[in-house]
Each structure stands twice: as C-alpha cells, then as structure tokens.
C-alpha cells in the first residue's frame, strides 16, 4: 500500500521538485530521483563527506592563497570606493552634458560662420583684381573727365548704371553708383561750361551728343540749355568791352552779334531738327525765334542807350554803317533788323545836333556877355559882296572876324552841321531845320535882351548895331547856305523863317532912320568902312584872294577860318 502510494505520488513529487530546483540544480535533482531508497539514505552521508572534503580543500586553498584573498578584498574595497566616486562624477557629467551640447552647437554655428567668411574671403581673393577695378571706377571716371576723355567717362557711367540695375540691394554697388553720379554732375557742369566758350559747330555736336548720352535733359530742355549757354558766352564777350567808351563798346557789340549770333543760329539749326512730323518733343515751339528776337531786342535797347553818348557825327555814321552790315549779314538767317534802325539813329542824330546847337548858343552868350565893344582892325572883303559869292563856297565871310560873338556862334553852327553831314537822315530835314532856326532865334533873342538891358555909349552902340546887321545879313544866310549843303533845298526852309530876326530888323530899321544915309554902316563894301562903325581910321579894302581849294565837294566838312576861334573840321 505504501509502495503504491509512493509509486503513485512519485511523478508528482518529481515534478514539484524539478520546479523548485534552479537550472543548475535540476541535473542533480534528476539524479536524486533516479536513486533507490537505500541510495537516497546514503546520500546525506556522502554529501557530508564531500562537504568536509571540500572544506578541507578550501582551507588548504585559503591557507595557500591567503595573500590573494587579502589583495582581492583590498581590491574589492578600492573598487567600491572608485565606483562610488565614478558614480558621483558620472552624475556631474550627466549634469554638464547639456552645457556641452549647447557649447558644441555654438561651436558648430561659429564654425559655419567662419567657414562662410572663409569662402567669401576665398572668393574675394579669387576676384580681387576685378573688384579692385570696380572700386576704382569713380576715380578713373574723374580722371577721364579732367582729361577730357568724355567718351570713356560715359562708358564707365553706363556700366555702373547697369550694375546698379542688376544689383539694387548691394550696398557697395549703390555706393559706387552714388560716387559715379557725383562725377557725372561734374562732367555735366564741364560740358555746359564748354558750351559757354568760343567753340565751333563740330565741338557743339560732340557736346550735345554727350549730353544726350547722359540723359539729364529732355529734347526741349537741351535746346533751351544750349541757347542759354551760348547767350551766356555772348554776354561774357559784351561784359569784357569797355562801356566807358560808347563808340568802341558799340563797335565791339555789333561785331560780336554780327559774327557770333549768326554762328549760334546756324549751330542750333545744324544740331537740332525742327521737323514737326516726328515726335512732338522734337519741336521747339519757336524757341529759336524767341531767343533770336530777345537778342535783337537787347541789341536795339543797347543802341538806344549808348547812341546818345556818341558826340561825333562821323562815329555815329560808322556805327550806322556797321549796324546795317550786321543786319544784312544776319538777314541770311532771317534776322534782318535794318528796318528797326532808322528811328534809333534819327533820335541820336537829332539829339546830337540839338546839343551842338545849344552849345553854340551858350558859347555865343558867354562871349557876348564878356565882349568889350572896342573897334577891331578891319579885314579885306570879297569885292562882289556876300550875295554874289560862289554858291559852292560856304567859307564864312572874313568880315565876321570883327565880331567875335558871331564868329564863335558860326563856329558852333559849322561844327554842328559838320557832325550832322556824315549821318543826316532825310526824314529829319524839317526837324533839323527847326532846331537850326531855334538856335538862330535864341541868338536873336539874346541880342534883343542885350540891347534892352545894357547901356552902351554911342561908339559901342554903333558896334553893337554892326554886329546885329552882320547877324541878319551874313550869319543867317550863311547858316541857311550851310544847311542847304547838308539837305538839298534846306536853305529855303531856313531863309523862309524870317521871323527869327524880326526884332533885330526893327532895331536896325530904327537906327537907319536916325542916321544920315551917307553915314549908315554898310555890311559889305568894296571901298571903305565908316570910322563910326569901326572906331578907327578908314582903311582901303583889299580884294580877298580866292583860294582854289575853297570849293568843296558835297561830302566835305564845312570849314570856318577865323583866327579868333579854332576851326572845327
């Protein structure tokens, strides 16, 4: 029964034992299960014996290897201490790892930046010469401008403008473009300054071509700028002239306009086209015409201001000739202004003649006021009388030398007419005649006032009456004759103005009625002059020798030969 129980429970017991045994113990347990009961009863003893044997062996080994055990124990202790230290350092390392990671990241970023800069430096080194050429463009362009190499300068400007368009965000390129723009402004100023100088058409064409390449001005603005610069050049020439000398200034101004104004108009027409069939901006809208009219107007205004300052008729005539020549030359470009000149010169001629006549009257008055009424030596007279003289001979009668005030007046009138003859406008014939008559009237009025305000002795009164008679019978006709030499038929106009000496005529008529007829003074005589008229003994008359050169051509000046007054030529 017990055997059956044991036999029946053996598999289960074996399974339970095997499940309790470890992997290293399972072979031994399996071996135990295979033993018999007797063998199993002996097994504890056998195990005890083996244990004792092993213990003895261990003791022997321990005795024989105690140093190794001590060393191992020391090593184990040291290892424990080191492991503990390593554990602490490991924890510290774990705490520092994030910092290390961050540092590595920063290093990587810095290294990348350095690498990037290195690449840039390498690229810069590889393109050093090209970049140097680019950076030297402003300096090179400035040198070209200073040396007059405008084509090369404009090529550089176009290249930099293209670079600035392609790389608008690069600061270096923009700075380069800014410097080039400054140099371009200098180039523009230099080109405009050249337009303000004395240059010919080929140079003008080159400069306008450069201005078009720069592109600062539109077509209309460029035309306007061209005319402004050329006007500034003309103004500079006129400013260099001496304005103190009106004659020389006008000569220089007329020559300037005659030569240079003609050139400027031709240059403008050659450079710019006025074809209205093209683009509207190519049409100047009468810009050249307006500018030319401005120049002509300025020319005429200057003439109007400066002509009254000319005091010689010959100079006035020369200015008129030059103005006519200038206007005729400018007529080739449509600027003939000859029709505008007569009023200016008529006014100047009239002013000059009026001034000279006023001077003659003033000088007469001065000499008359200071004149001492003493008889002067008589001189020879023409045998045939005043009215029978040659019509071409306008030499003042020598009889007038006995009357210094009249001689001075005749000198002044001759001077005025001599200044008038080179430039005597026919339209002023009556006006000039009126001025001459007005001067004669002023002399007559002066003599009347003198007669009224002065108390003269008998001898002085006779001399005064002789002077008045000489004025009426000699001076007045002589002035009319001289005026007729300037204006054909003008003598009649003057002679018809008898009202100028009516007062003197009445005085002379009254004096003649009071004196015996045989003692009345005669202005022109072939025998003798009355002693009461001269205050000296009568002297025989000598017939004046005729000078073969006395007869002059129509264009010759009117001479006055008196020893008291220097003749005016």
From Swiss-Prot:
Main localisation: Golgi
UniProt topology in membrane: Peripheral membrane protein
Region (Disordered) residue spans: 511-569
Subunit relationships: Homodimer. Component of the conserved oligomeric Golgi complex which is composed of eight different subunits and is required for normal Golgi morphology and localization. Interacts with COG1, COG3, COG5 and COG6.
Protein name: Conserved oligomeric Golgi complex subunit 8
Cellular-component GO terms for this entry: Golgi membrane; Golgi transport complex; plasmodesma
Species: Arabidopsis thaliana
TM ranges: none
Keywords: Golgi apparatus, Membrane, Protein transport, Transport
Biased composition (Polar residues): 511-526
Subcellular location: Golgi apparatus membrane
Chain intervals with Basic and acidic residues compositional bias: 540-554
InterPro entries recorded: COG8 (IPR007255), COG8_Metazoal_Plant (IPR016632), Cullin_repeat-like_dom_sf (IPR016159)
Gene knockout outcome: Male-specific transmission defect due to incorrect deposition of cell wall components and proteins during pollen tube elongation, thus leading to disrupted pollen tube growth. Embryo- and seedling-lethal associated with white seeds in siliques, delayed embryo development from the early stages, arrested at heart stages and resulting in abnormal curled cotyledons. Altered Golgi bodies morphology. Impaired Gamma-COP and TMN1/EMP12 tight association with the Golgi.
UniProt similarity note: Belongs to the COG8 family.
Function description: Acts as a component of the peripheral membrane COG complex that is involved in intra-Golgi protein trafficking. Involved in pollen tube growth by modulating Golgi morphology and vesicle trafficking homeostasis leading to the deposition of cell wall components and proteins at the pollen tube tip. Required for sporophytic development.
Biological processes per GO annotation: Golgi organization; Golgi vesicle transport; pollen tube growth; protein transport
GO MF annotation list: protein homodimerization activity
Protein encoded by which gene: COG8
């Amino acid at each position: 029964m017990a055997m059956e129980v044991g036999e029946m429970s053996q598999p289960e017991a074996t399974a339970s034992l095997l499940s309790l045994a470890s992997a290293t113990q399972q072979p031994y347990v399996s071996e135990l299960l295979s033993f018999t009961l007797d063998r199993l009863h002996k097994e504890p003893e056998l195990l005890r014996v083996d244990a004792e044997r092993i213990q003895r062996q261990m003791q022997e080994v321990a005795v024989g290897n105690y140093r190794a055990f001590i060393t191992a124990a020391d090593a184990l202790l040291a290892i424990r201490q080191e492991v503990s230290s390593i554990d602490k350092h490991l924890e510290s390392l774990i705490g520092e790892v994030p910092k290390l990671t961050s540092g590595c990241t920063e290093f990587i970023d810095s290294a990348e930046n350095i690498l990037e800069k290195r690449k840039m430096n390498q690229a810069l080194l590889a393109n050093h010469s090209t970049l140097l050429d680019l950076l030297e463009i402003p300096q090179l362009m400035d040198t070209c401008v200073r040396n007059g190499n405008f084509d090369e300068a404009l090529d550089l400007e176009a290249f930099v403008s293209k670079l600035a368009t392609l790389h608008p965000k690069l600061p270096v390129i923009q700075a380069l473009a800014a410097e080039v723009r400054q140099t371009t402004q200098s180039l523009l100023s230099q080109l405009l300054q050249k337009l303000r100088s004395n240059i010919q058409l080929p140079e003008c064409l080159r400069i306008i071509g450069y201005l078009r390449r720069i592109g600062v001005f539109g077509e209309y603005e460029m035309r306007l700028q061209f005319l402004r610069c050329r006007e500034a050049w003309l103004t500079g020439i006129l400013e260099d002239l001496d304005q103190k000398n009106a004659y020389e200034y006008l000569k220089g101004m007329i020559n300037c306009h005659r030569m240079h104004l003609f050139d400027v108009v031709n240059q403008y027409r050659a450079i710019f086209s006025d074809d209205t069939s093209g683009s509207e901006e190519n049409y100047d809208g009468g810009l050249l015409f307006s500018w030319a009219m401005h120049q002509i107007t300025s020319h005429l205004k200057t003439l109007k201001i400066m002509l009254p300052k000319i005091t010689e008729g010959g100079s006035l005539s020369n200015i008129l000739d030059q103005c006519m020549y200038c206007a005729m030359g400018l007529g080739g470009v449509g600027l003939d202004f000859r029709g505008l000149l007569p009023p200016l010169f008529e006014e100047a001629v009239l002013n000059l003649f009026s001034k000279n006549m006023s001077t003659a009257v003033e000088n007469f008055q001065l000499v008359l006021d200071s004149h001492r009424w003493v008889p002067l030596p008589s001189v020879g007279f023409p045998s045939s009388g005043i009215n029978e003289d040659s019509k071409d001979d306008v030499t003042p009668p020598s009889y007038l030398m006995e009357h210094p005030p009249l001689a001075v007046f005749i000198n002044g009138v001759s001077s005025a007419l001599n200044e008038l003859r080179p430039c005597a406008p026919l339209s002023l014939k009556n006006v000039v005649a009126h001025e001459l008559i007005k001067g004669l009237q002023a002399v007559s009025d002066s003599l009347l006032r003198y007669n009224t305000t002065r108390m003269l002795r008998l001898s002085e009164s006779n001399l005064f009456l002789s002077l008045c008679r000489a004025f009426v019978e000699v001076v007045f006709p002589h002035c009319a004759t001289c005026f007729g030499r300037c204006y054909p038929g003008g003598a009649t106009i003057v002679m018809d103005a008898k009202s100028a000496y009516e007062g003197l005529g009445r005085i002379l008529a009254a004096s003649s009625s009071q004196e015996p007829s045989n003692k009345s003074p005669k202005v022109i005589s072939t025998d003798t002059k009355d002693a009461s008229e001269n205050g000296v003994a009568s002297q025989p008359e000598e017939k004046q020798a005729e000078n073969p050169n006395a007869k002059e051509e129509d264009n010759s000046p009117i001479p006055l030969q008196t020893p008291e007054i220097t003749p005016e030529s």
